[in-house]
């Protein structure tokens, strides 16, 4: 998070997502004395990737604090807020979802958070991933490649990145990645647990800010061609530097 001050000296803590490339979670948890705050499934996990992992547990929003506020106080409040949002959404979730625990829903919500910033698309993205999981299909979502690459990501995904088997690359692993890959908003958590009524299995960017959702690989491939055409057209209209 970032700490800002207004002209009255009031601190404003702004929590932002930096893609989670700093993985010294245990050290951070110890330094900020967060061990007693985090849930047992994280602290006591036998999976070294999950153990002490802080990703996803803090609700992204703007919070206001006065002088003397500590990092631990701020993060405790953010954690409690995320727990409240997740618990309420989980208790009111739609039936027959493929998620066994609230933590799995948090993981999915973080992926939706990274896939689209268009509010009305979140339930559709959620439906695509639910449908793929229900059918035993791999999720094949690019943000998981990027997260698994960490600091090696330089702005482009290459074929070798798609083919690399990391713990997060959902082109190479079945099901969900082991932890969240971002800080999911309440809207993404809600979309995860209330997906749209859709049979879509694929989506691709349109080149104009949104995505096109399709039910078959043939239709998806056509949508990809259309996207590439839009991008070529935009590139041709860009004046030389």
List where the protein language model places each region:
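Bacterial extracytoplasmic/cell-wall-associated proteins, especially those involved in peptidoglycan
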Residues: 3-16, 20, 25-241
